[in-house]
Amino acid sequence: TNKILQESLSKYISEEKIDSVYISISGNHIQSFNATGRAAIADNKEVSKQDLKSVEESAKAITLSNDQEILHVLSKDYEIDGQDGIKVPLGMSGIALDGRYHLVTGAKNARDNLEKCVKKCIGSGNKNLEPTDVVLEQLASSMSVLTEDEKELGVCLVDIGGGTTDIAIFSNG
């Protein structure tokens, strides 16, 4: 893998100005599930960015095995004082804020090994270039081929690769 990646990257690094590198990750170690978080709205006023962060942290307070980590926290919707289906609660008034999320987890070692491989391959060609982030393969594919409207209306993305086929279903964003 290192050799193939190094050959591909060295060609592009020498021909193009590359500002960032995103690494896609997949495999049977990837898991996803729904989680909810809850927080009181500070001072019983308007929902702030800090309130959103508190709700997300509450949803992330889950028990994972030592070899797993959270890769993505994807917000689905929010509820304020029983009013549900809210996509953007920022600035709305209320007392209690609930958030529904889809969490994606993966093996720490798989992520670390991918990052090491990419760093080794790009390190010789450009000392200032570092991986920006590791992204679930299906999410990376969706960012390049789907519009926000398609994800909102609902779509099934099927990515047929050389060795695997990945499926991602988007509904309500």
What spans do the regions from the language model cover?
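Nucleotide/phosphate-binding catalytic cleft detector across ATP-hydrolyzing
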Residues: 1-157
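Glycine-rich phosphate-binding loop of actin/hexokinase-like ATP-binding domains
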Residues: 153-173
